């Protein structure tokens, strides 16, 4: 699959991958049909090579080929199958299809000489209720009555004639219900309970171990998963597969019994696991093949049916013949495959959305192989299905962590770029370190600048690079950037002459003739198989389907392809492109030692200005801190704080009321002396973590009551804690914001103490009773109190005796829909931990109520015991935030959404402005090449200065950097004349519209003085203050610009220039509100106020200031800045 696209959004990329997979599915079908026709003459390697070019010529001959590939009518012989007519299945359970071995397995008795009537006839139209005992029929009908019939799998049934036990596994397909029957082996203890709660217990140890692993180590996670599955299943080999972006697979982890050939590191083509199989893995996450040599059993269906039965969801579905042969060739007779399905998109979306569904993708597989036939009972397989779900959740978290690391690395790109360009720009990007090869992962890079070529690392020759540049200019002139993982697939004529050295390339065009290239070698060069090596003289048969052939075929496919270019890598490349466009405009002469002295002096002055600014900000922070302290003191929730030694230094009115301890007495006491003994260890651990900077939420502890409150007992608090830090980011204390749950805890404690009379409490409509629901030991809902009814909108009679996992809380057709599959798995883990007797902590929980509103709360689960101490179910308690807190959170979400929308709108506008701006720059450059007069050239220079100022403003994405004084100024030579003329040009349209006369009173020698500093920022400041002055000048008035310049000698030949400009205007002047905003004295800034504040901060960065003077009938802005006299630098 070629990826030679100039640029592509992530959504387009996803659509492209989807289209490629759809095309690959039809190719898979053709390969399968070819295999069936070829038999023993099938050539595996050539089929894989052909599949690599999935074009119109290689499409299957008809849709029937694809249909035959997807619709098989064979099952494995270890079980049997029935299909029931879905229309009246609750009354008649009429058979419309059955497997040929069904009569033998279900109706034959065990004695040698059968009697008449021993077994009922089985055929089309048979009522299956005649085949099983009454309790079995009752269980089947109960399952068939569920909206999701698979929730109760497996269902234990007994044959009426033989009494043999079977597991019935039910699923729904179009027009029918498919029931797979798997025999219960003599050595098994039959599982009489249905659903996930019982199956979980079989994998509890492995799940607990997975959940205990620390984050940030994908290799350890995969190792643990493979080890646990190996121990749990007993198979000879367990491998973890990972699917890459191009859908090829890799064995990333493996564990085997001795004497088996290892496959670790094996890469295999995408065709080895067809797209149709991958789709089925997403639907049915466990797949078992008991014996690949076993003869398959046909399924017979009613000839009157208008449709073909689809057996894709059957646990008994027979493997395709090509897969069975592949298994046999690698000496694998039995297999068990567990699918690892993760969320495809990265963002959860709005929690209030009505349908916040995530798309899923198949991340990989955990594959078990055995050298002899092996059967795993369904309950054990179901438990193994739960295990990869937990594993998939952890994989998803690791993927998100990897994305965060990538984003963090992206933040380092500007630093790399600046380091490259600070020395000998622009040639420093190729001749210094770091250079362009350090920007992204590559094998080589090249720069074409002024018709010369600089090469780094492994690259094509200089003539070949020039040929590539010419090809890009001819065929990709419309794009300024280009990337591909295969120059051959992209259409480069001389790609074959490059050999294996260069396959992939990314490039950017800086100017019409200057370009930067990055090169990558073929993927196969970076791939090593850790499997067994050949013995002397041993050779592979490439026609034979085998892992060695798969690896060889994969190398054949990727030998002319490199690793794909990631989006974040192209972002870094584009960033360099933007910076180089400015750097390539002209080569600036290097400055002498005097320039370095000026830079040093200016940096010192800048630091002094920053320190002054910090003092000013500290004063502002002190005022803000005082206000926060006042708010905390009067808050309606308990708030307390301690210093690094654990001594209380914050104790608000609410906590004083609850504990009976006045503020003066609490201050200075150690927090551990104020909490209950039972909470000491928990609070001590919490303090230690907080002092290390680790924040924690929803921590519960009890605090003592004193004085008048002593007899009321301890106060139960749930706190969110955060570390308090000083200006140097050192932790100086801990702040606790608490929620009083004493009333709820007293109710819960009373409930636990008086369990025999729990109904009087649970069903009480007192508002202090929290929402409570419960299940029995089999997962059926057995409790749903009034508070739960009010919260969810579902009545008690609507949920009782339904499966809690799936029917009540689930992701599809459940009453209370969960946000995603991860939430469903986490709920199952919490319930099952309590069911197995393990201690559980409060966990965040959320679901959509009947009215579509998303409910967020904390879930606490307690086991329910009978008189003998056996677990008979669980009780679940929900803790909701107070209405005030919910309102605050709602307002916060609305504010975040509004800010996000504004940020998106701003990003869109900035992005849309850049393209027209590039067009304006291009038009100006074209005009510069024409025959222009002096006045016209001056207008072009003014236009260029305005364009550069606009580009600079568009790059200002973080205003806090400017406000806090951390913006880097770009120093260059300029004259005040250039700056003033450009600034005046930006306000002339406005002044002409108001008939305002602008007078330039700056002396000529000052105007022509050559200065050294950031001219664009000075121009930006001056233009804004001119605009504000004109806005508040009456029509027909006058604005006068005057200036003065003084020099202070630094050393023998360097002069520091103190520039002062005044902008005087008539009228009543600028309102005080705006001036207060300019000086940062008002937090509610208008657009004009923000503009003035930013310009004042820019002057601060230039060691300057702004003042505003009022006189009778006129007012003036006085602007000052410190620069350097540039003409003295060359002396």
UniProtKB/Swiss-Prot annotation:
The terms describing its cellular component in GO are: nucleus
Q: Which CDD domains match?
A: PAS
For the Histidine kinase domain, which residue ranges apply? Answer: 908-1127
Domain spans labelled PAS:
624-694, 757-831
Which keywords does the record carry? Chromophore, Photoreceptor protein, Phytochrome signaling pathway, Receptor, Repeat, Sensory transduction, Transcription, Transcription regulation
PTM statement from Swiss-Prot or TrEMBL: Contains one covalently linked phytochromobilin chromophore.
Indicate, by first and last residue, each region the UniProt record lists as having compositional bias (Low complexity). 1-13
Nucleotide-binding listed as a keyword: no
Q: Is Translocase there in the keyword field?
A: no
Give the matching InterPro entries. Answer: GAF (IPR003018), GAF-like_dom_sf (IPR029016), HATPase_C_sf (IPR036890), His_kinase_dom (IPR005467), HisK_dim/P_dom (IPR003661), PAS (IPR000014), PAS-like_dom_sf (IPR035965), PAS_2 (IPR013654)
Entry-linked PROSITE patterns:
HIS_KIN, PAS, PHYTOCHROME_1, PHYTOCHROME_2
Q: Which Pfam families match?
A: GAF, HATPase_c, HisKA, PAS, PAS_2, PHY
What task does this protein carry out? Regulatory photoreceptor which exists in two forms that are reversibly interconvertible by light: the Pr form that absorbs maximally in the red region of the spectrum and the Pfr form that absorbs maximally in the far-red region. Photoconversion of Pr to Pfr induces an array of morphogenic responses, whereas reconversion of Pfr to Pr cancels the induction of those responses. Pfr controls the expression of a number of nuclear genes including those encoding the small subunit of ribulose-bisphosphate carboxylase, chlorophyll A/B binding protein, protochlorophyllide reductase, rRNA, etc.
Q: Which family does it belong to?
A: Belongs to the phytochrome family.
Under the subunit heading, UniProt states: Homodimer.
> What protein name applies here?
Phytochrome A
What species is this protein from? Answer: Glycine max (Soybean)
Q: Which gene encodes it?
A: PHYA
């Amino acid at each position: 699959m070629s990826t030679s696209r100039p640029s592509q959004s992530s959504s387009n990329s996803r659509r492209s991958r989807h289209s490629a997979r759809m095309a690959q599915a039809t190719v898979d079908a053709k390969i399968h049909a070819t295999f069936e026709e070829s038999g023993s003459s099938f050539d595996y390697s050539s089929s894989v090579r052909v599949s690599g070019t999935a074009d119109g010529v290689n499409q299957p001959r008809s849709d029937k080929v694809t249909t035959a590939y997807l619709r098989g009518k064979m099952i494995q012989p270890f079980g049997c199958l029935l299909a029931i007519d879905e229309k009246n299945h609750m009354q008649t359970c009429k058979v419309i299809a059955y497997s040929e071995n069904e009569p033998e397995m279900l109706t034959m008795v065990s004695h040698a000489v059968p009697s008449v009537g021993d077994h009922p006839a089985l055929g089309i139209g048979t009522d299956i209720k005649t085949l099983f005992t009454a309790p079995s029929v009752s269980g089947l009908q109960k399952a068939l009555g569920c909206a999701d019939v698979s929730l109760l799998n497996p269902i234990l049934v007994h044959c009426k004639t033989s009494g043999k036990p079977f597991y019935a596994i039910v699923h729904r397909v179009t027009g029918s219900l498919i029931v797979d029957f798997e025999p219960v082996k003599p050595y098994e203890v039959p599982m009489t309970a249905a659903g996930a709660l019982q199956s979980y217990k079989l994998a509890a140890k492995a799940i607990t171990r997975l959940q205990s692993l620390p984050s940030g180590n994908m290799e350890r996670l995969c190792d643990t998963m493979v080890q646990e599955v190996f121990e749990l299943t007993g198979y000879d080999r367990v491998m973890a597969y990972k699917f890459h972006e191009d859908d090829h697979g890799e064995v990333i982890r493996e564990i085997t019994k001795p004497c088996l050939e290892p496959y670790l590191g094996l890469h295999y083509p995408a065709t080895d696991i067809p797209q149709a199989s991958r789709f089925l893995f997403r639907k049915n996450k466990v797949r078992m093949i008991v014996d690949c040599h076993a003869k398959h059993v046909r399924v017979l269906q009613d000839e009157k049916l208008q449709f073909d039965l689809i057996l894709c969801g059957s646990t008994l579905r027979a493997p395709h013949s090509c897969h069975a042969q592949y298994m046999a060739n690698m000496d694998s007779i039995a297999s068990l495959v567990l699918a690892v399905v993760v969320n495809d998109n990265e963002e959860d979306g709005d929690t209030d959305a009505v349908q916040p569904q995530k798309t899923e993708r198949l991340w990989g597989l955990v594959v078990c192989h055995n050298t002899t036939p092996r059967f795993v009972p369904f309950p054990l397989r179901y438990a193994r299905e739960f295990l990869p779900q937990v594993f998939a959740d952890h994989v998803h978290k690791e993927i998100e962590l990897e994305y965060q690391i990538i984003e963090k690395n992206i933040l380092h790109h500007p630093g790399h770029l600046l380091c490259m360009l600070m020395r000998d720009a622009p040639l420093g990007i190729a001749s210094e370190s770091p250079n362009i090869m350090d920007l992204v992962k590559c094998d080589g890079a090249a720069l074409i600048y002024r018709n010369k070529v600089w090469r780094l690392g492994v690259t094509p020759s200089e003539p070949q690079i020039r040929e590539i540049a010419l090809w890009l200019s001819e065929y990709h002139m419309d794009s300024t950037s280009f990337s591909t993982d295969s120059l051959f697939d992209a259409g480069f004529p001389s790609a074959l002459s490059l050999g294996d050295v260069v396959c992939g390339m990314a490039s950017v065009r800086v100017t019409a003739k200057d370009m930067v290239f990055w090169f990558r070698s073929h993927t196969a060069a970076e791939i090593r198989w850790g499997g067994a090596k050949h013995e002397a003289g041993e050779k592979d048969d490439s026609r034979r389907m085998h892992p060695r052939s798969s690896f060889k075929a994969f190398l054949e496919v990727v030998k002319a392809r490199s690793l794909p270019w990631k989006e974040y890598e192209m972002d870094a490349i584009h960033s360099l492109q933007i910076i180089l466009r400015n750097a390539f405009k002209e080569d600036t002469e290097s400055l002498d030692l005097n320039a370095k002295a000026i830079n040093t002096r200016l940096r010192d002055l800048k630091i002094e200005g920053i320190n002054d600014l910090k003092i000013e900000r500290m004063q502002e922070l002190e005022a803000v801190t005082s206000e926060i302290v006042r708010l905390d003191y009067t808050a309606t929730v308990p708030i307390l704080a301690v210093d690094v030694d654990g001594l209380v230094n914050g104790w608000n009115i609410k906590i004083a009321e609850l504990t009976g301890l006045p503020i003066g007495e609490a201050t200075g006491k150690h927090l551990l002396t104020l909490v209950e003994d039972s909470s000491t260890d928990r609070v001590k651990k919490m303090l230690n973590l907080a002092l290390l900077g680790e924040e924690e939420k929803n921590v519960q502890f009890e605090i003592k009551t004193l004085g008048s409150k002593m007899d009321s007992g301890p106060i139960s608090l749930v706190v969110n804690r955060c570390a308090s830090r000083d200006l140097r980011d050192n932790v100086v204390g801990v702040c606790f914001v608490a929620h009083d749950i004493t009333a709820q805890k007293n109710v819960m404690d009373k409930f636990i103490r008086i369990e025999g009379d729990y109904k009087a409490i649970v069903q009480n409509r007192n508002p202090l009773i929290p929402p409570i629901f419960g299940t029995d030991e089999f997962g059926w809902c057995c409790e749903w109190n009034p508070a739960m009814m009010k919260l969810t909108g579902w009545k008690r009679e609507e949920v009782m005796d339904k499966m809690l996992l799936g029917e009540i809380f689930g992701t599809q057709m459940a009453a209370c829909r969960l946000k995603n599959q991860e939430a469903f798995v986490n709920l199952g883990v919490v319930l099952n931990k309590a069911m197995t007797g393990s201690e559980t902590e409060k966990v965040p929980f959320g679901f959509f109520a009947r009215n579509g509103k998303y409910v967020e709360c904390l879930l606490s689960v307690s086991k329910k015991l009978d008189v003998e101490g056996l677990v008979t179910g669980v009780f679940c308690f929900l803790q909701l935030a107070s209405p005030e807190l919910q309102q605050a959170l709602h307002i916060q979400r609305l504010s975040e959404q509004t800010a996000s929308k504004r940020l998106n709108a701003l990003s869109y506008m900035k992005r849309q402005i850049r393209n027209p701006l590039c067009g304006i720059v291009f038009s100006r450059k074209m005009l510069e090449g024409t025959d222009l007069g002096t006045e016209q050239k001056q207008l072009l220079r003014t236009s260029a200065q305005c364009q550069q100022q606009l580009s600079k403003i568009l790059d200002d994405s973080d205003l806090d950097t400017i406000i806090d004084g951390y913006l880097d100024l770009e120093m260059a030579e300029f004259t005040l004349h250039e700056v003033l003329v450009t600034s005046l040009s930006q306000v002339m349209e406005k002044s002409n519209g108001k008939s305002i006369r602008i007078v330039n009173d700056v002396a000529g020698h000052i105007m022509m003085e050559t200065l050294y500093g950031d001219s664009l920022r000075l121009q930006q400041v001056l233009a804004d203050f001119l605009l504000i002055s004109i806005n508040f000048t009456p029509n027909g008035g006058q604005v006068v610009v005057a200036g003065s310049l003084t020099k202070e000698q630094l050393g023998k030949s360097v002069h520091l220039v103190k520039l002062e400009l005044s902008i005087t205007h008539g009228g009543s002047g600028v309102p005080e509100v705006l001036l207060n905003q300019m000086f940062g004295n008002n937090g509610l800034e208008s657009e004009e106020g923000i503009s003035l504040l930013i310009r004042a901060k820019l002057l601060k960065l230039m060691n300057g200031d702004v003042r505003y003077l009022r006189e009778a009938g006129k007012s003036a802005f006085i602007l000052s800045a410190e620069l350097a006299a540039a003409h003295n630098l060359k002396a």
